[in-house]
């Protein structure tokens, strides 16, 4: 049932009657959701039957679960499948011990039990998705017609068709996440979710978001998580458990009792490598250039390492963070930024120094050239201090001389690598064998490829890197990656030089020797590298480690791996989830049916990619060309000929029907002609008899006065307007006679001041020299008194008797005074406007 719906009658039938009544009552009283709970959370808290089945169940198939015996039977696989069918399980097995087989068996049984539901297998990359899909075809016999491979390269319309017609999907996590968010994939139909490389399920990775979205509206789905190592630390493993609702961990190591018989012996040899004289000289000279910056940090006790030869980017960044957290808050801005920029510059040049010691002179030189380009493009004053150092340019010149020598070996590791690889392939019994070399950075991989290419055809090397472009170096396309893997599996390539992309997930094939060109401090990466060999026959592992820091890094990785495995097996420090709900009804107790699975013929056929179907009509292109420009193909003979003129269609002029106005309409028209001035734009709007209602703030008194005046003005007829015009003309004639007296007399202050309660009669009597004019004007005021009283019908104030009552009676109360002031203000406004 969805979070926001109560209308489904089928969901209500399985609930207890009392629970239904209670929910309906609270729903009608609008009390559900006030505490922030969703409908599913409310059901979880109040429903006695938490295992409501959402998917259509095949009851006959639910009586048993099928275990294929097409391949050799292994106890640990059988035991893990038995647990994974009924709980959310995290399976941690070394590489090559059949995690895909376990997932395929679980998927097959859920498809049998719930034939109309969705079975989803998620893998982080498209090559992994394709590989797992082909493996499931061969193991469980799921027909190809029921499966689909979905990634971002598949159009949305095609994915929508697959969701309507198929049930088993092999997808990348971001693709199905987008489909769920946009409603293309019905999340309530998913009954089984398999997650490959589950150690990625932390933070905001798409795995975590997919499981979260499914949990919001679907409690009937099983989760099976697969990984060689679930995490570097217990905190990371706990994050995976919480994100994927894991209720059980099935972990095996190469020393486990039920695993040891299926694991071939592996020989691990260490080759400690001493630095060459050239590398030592370059290290010392470059360290002396970094020494002034290091001493600057040492004086303030911001960085403890005293020797520039021992600095690393990691320790510099740690010291910078400690400075910001503790001391950096109390420093002046200039001094603080000076220290931070020094940290940044030192961390930038510490990384090339690490490349020099562990990978060689060429990667060191290439990295410094990249830093130089960054400095000249951006504003990097502190880094330029290193580049502009007097000893920096001579050092780079000497390195360039060394690299021009074709016989020069950039690091002693390459000499050890040459001896190991050439001797191994010279043996007769190892002509069909393969070697895989792991390296952290691409520049080292490219140098190894050039170095081993000299020993062709005994050594046939190929590089295997990621798709993303780094700096100026482009990555490998997915097509080229797949071709390289196939060539390695067929034996056309017998030495594969891989970065971290070769460590995770991909089925590279049979590898008899692993060479680790550098050490990784991560237990996950260490285990994944070593797990590539020793699957069907004895494996060899060679570690090429520079003496000192790289040796210590390897020892730390081994210790961390042992401690981590012991903690996982014992369960110390881990808390499992309780959200692993039962999906099959309790009355069904399926028993195991071991049988040979028939593989459909369609699964063995080579799939030809279908041609792309054009689902949308092409949009007609718009060419922004000048008028009368030639477009398209035109012959030379047609260039001199004039274009054929198109027939012009002459339209007849539009006839305007004569209109006669009535007498009243003519008067209105004349009125508008008189009012409208040149350049005045008048828009006749709808007449409002009342002012519109406002919100919290009422209309001002000025607005109300103007509205009342305009309303009154609209009621004036033409005869009254003519009378007013004559009276005003007479008043102007009288005022011109008395103008000489006013001009010679100095104005006084009371001539400009208006009283609070002006009375036209009393005010005009004070000015004896204006009696005739003032009396006429007061008459004009009193002509409008009736209309003013109509504007405020609730005000019972007599204007004619107001002055007499004011002298005999007590003052008015506050309300009457305010109303009186409003009436007189409107009178004053109308008189002024007229």
UniProtKB/Swiss-Prot annotation:
Catalyzed chemical reaction(s): ATP + H2O = ADP + phosphate + H(+)
Residue segments, region Interaction with MHF complex: 650-690
SUPFAM superfamilies listed in its UniProt record: P-loop containing nucleoside triphosphate hydrolases
UniProt superkingdom: Eukaryota
Transmembrane feature ranges: none
Disruption of the gene: reported phenotype: Hypersensitive to the alkylating agent methyl methanesulfonate (MMS) and the cross-linking agent cisplatin.
E.C. code: 3.6.4.12
Keyword terms: ATP-binding, Cytoplasm, DNA damage, DNA repair, DNA-binding, Helicase, Hydrolase, Nucleotide-binding, Nucleus
EC class of the enzyme, as a word: hydrolase
Keyword Nucleotide-binding carried by entry: yes
Binding-site positions, ATP: 93-100
Any single Gene Ontology cellular-component annotation: nucleolus
Ranges of Basic and acidic residues composition bias in the record: 740-754
Residue ranges of domain Helicase C-terminal in the record: 416-582
Motif residue range(s): DEAH box: 196-199
Molecular functions (GO terms): 3'-5' DNA helicase activity; ATP binding; ATP hydrolysis activity; four-way junction DNA binding; four-way junction helicase activity
GO biological process terms held by the UniProt record: DNA strand displacement; double-strand break repair via synthesis-dependent strand annealing; interstrand cross-link repair; meiotic strand displacement involved in double-strand break repair via SDSA; Okazaki fragment processing involved in mitotic DNA replication; reciprocal meiotic recombination; recombinational interstrand cross-link repair; replication fork processing
Protein name stated in the entry: ATP-dependent DNA helicase fml1
Organism the protein comes from: Schizosaccharomyces pombe (strain 972 / ATCC 24843)
Lineage: Eukaryota, Fungi, Dikarya, Ascomycota, Taphrinomycotina
Gene: fml1
């Amino acid at each position: 049932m969805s979070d926001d719906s109560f209308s489904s009658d089928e969901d209500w039938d399985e609930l207890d009657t009392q629970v239904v009544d209670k929910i309906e009552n609270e729903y009608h009283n609008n009390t559900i959701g006030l505490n922030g709970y969703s409908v599913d959370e409310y059901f979880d808290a109040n429903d006695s039957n938490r295992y409501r089945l959402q998917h259509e169940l095949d009851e006959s198939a639910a009586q048993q679960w099928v275990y294929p015996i097409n391949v050799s039977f292994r106890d640990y696989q059988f035991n893990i499948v038995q647990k994974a069918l009924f709980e959310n399980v995290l399976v941690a097995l070394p590489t090559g011990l059949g995690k895909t087989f376990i997932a395929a068996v679980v998927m097959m049984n859920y498809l049998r039990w719930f034939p109309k539901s969705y079975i989803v297998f998620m893998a982080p990359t498209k090559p992994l998705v394709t590989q797992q899909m082909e493996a499931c075809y061969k193991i469980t016999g799921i027909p190809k017609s029921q499966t689909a491979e979905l990634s971002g390269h598949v159009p949305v319309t095609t994915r929508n068709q697959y969701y309507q017609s198929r049930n088993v999907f092999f997808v990348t996590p971001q693709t199905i996440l987008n489909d769920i968010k946009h409603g293309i994939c019905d999340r309530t139909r998913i009954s089984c979710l398999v997650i490959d490389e589950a150690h990625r399920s932390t933070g905001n990775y798409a795995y975590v978001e997919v499981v979260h979205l499914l949990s919001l509206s679907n409690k009937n789905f099983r989760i099976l998580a697969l990984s060689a190592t679930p995490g570097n630390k217990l905190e990371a493993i706990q994050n995976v458990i919480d994100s994927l609702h894991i209720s059980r961990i099935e972990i095996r190591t190469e020393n486990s009792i039920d695993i040891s018989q299926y694991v071939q012996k592996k020989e691990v040899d260490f080759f400690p490598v001493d630095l060459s004289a050239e590398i030592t000289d370059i290290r010392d000279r470059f360290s002396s250039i970094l020494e002034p910056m290091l001493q600057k940090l040492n004086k303030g006790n911001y960085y403890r390492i005293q020797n520039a030869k021992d600095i690393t980017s990691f320790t510099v960044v740690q010291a910078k963070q400690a400075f910001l957290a503790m001391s950096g808050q109390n420093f002046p801005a200039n001094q603080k930024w000076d220290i931070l920029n020094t940290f940044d510059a030192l961390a930038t040049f510490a990384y090339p120094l690490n490349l020099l010691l562990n990978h060689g002179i060429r990667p060191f030189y290439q990295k410094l050239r990249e830093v130089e380009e960054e400095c000249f493009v951006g504003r990097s004053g502190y880094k330029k201090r290193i580049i502009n150092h007097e000893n920096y340019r001579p050092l780079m010149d000497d390195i360039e001389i060394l690299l021009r020598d074709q016989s020069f070996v950039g690091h002693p590791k390459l000499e050890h690598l040459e001896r190991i690889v050439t001797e191994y392939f010279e043996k007769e019994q190892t002509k069909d064998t393969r070697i895989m070399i792991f390296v952290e950075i691409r520049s080292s991989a490219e140098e190894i490829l050039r170095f081993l290419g000299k020993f062709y055809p005994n050594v046939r090397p190929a590089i295997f890197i990621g798709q993303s472009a780094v700096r100026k170096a482009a990555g490998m396309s997915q097509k080229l990656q797949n071709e390289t893997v196939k060539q390695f599996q067929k034996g056309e390539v017998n030495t594969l030089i891989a970065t971290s992309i070769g460590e995770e997930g991909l089925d590279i094939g049979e590898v008899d020797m692993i060479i680790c060109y550098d050490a990784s401090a991560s237990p996950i990466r260490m285990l994944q590298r070593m797990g590539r060999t020793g699957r069907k026959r004895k494996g060899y592992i060679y570690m090429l480690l520079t003496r000192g820091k790289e040796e210590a890094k390897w020892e730390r990785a081994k210790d961390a791996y042992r401690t981590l495995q012991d903690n996982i097996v014992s369960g110390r420090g881990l808390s499992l989830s309780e959200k692993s709900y039962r999906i099959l009804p309790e009355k069904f107790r399926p028993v195991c049916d071991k049988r040979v699975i028939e593989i459909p013929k369609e699964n063995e056929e080579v799939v030809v990619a279908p041609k792309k179907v054009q689902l949308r009509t092409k949009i007609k292109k718009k060419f922004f060309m000048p008028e009368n420009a030639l477009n398209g193909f035109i012959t030379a003979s047609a260039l001199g000929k004039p274009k054929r003129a198109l027939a012009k269609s002459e339209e007849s002029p539009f006839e305007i029907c004569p209109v006669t106005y009535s007498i009243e309409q003519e008067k209105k028209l004349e009125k508008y002609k008189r009012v409208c001035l040149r350049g005045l734009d008048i828009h006749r709007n709808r007449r409002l008899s009342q002012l519109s209602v406002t919100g919290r703030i009422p209309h001002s008194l000025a607005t109300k006065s103007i509205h009342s005046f305009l309303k009154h003005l609209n009621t004036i007829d033409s005869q009254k307007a003519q009378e007013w015009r004559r009276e005003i003309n007479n008043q102007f004639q009288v005022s011109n006679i008395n103008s000489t007296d006013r001009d010679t007399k100095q104005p006084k202050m009371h001539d400009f001041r208006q009283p609070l309660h002006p009375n036209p009669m009393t005010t005009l009597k004070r000015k004896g020299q204006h009696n005739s004019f003032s009396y006429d004007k007061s008459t004009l005021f009193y002509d409008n008194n009736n209309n003013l009283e109509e504007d405020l019908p609730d005000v019972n104030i007599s204007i004619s008797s107001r002055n007499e009552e004011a002298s005999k009676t007590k003052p008015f109360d506050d309300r009457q005074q305010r109303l009186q002031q409003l009436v007189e203000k409107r009178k004053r406004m109308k008189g002024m406007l007229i």
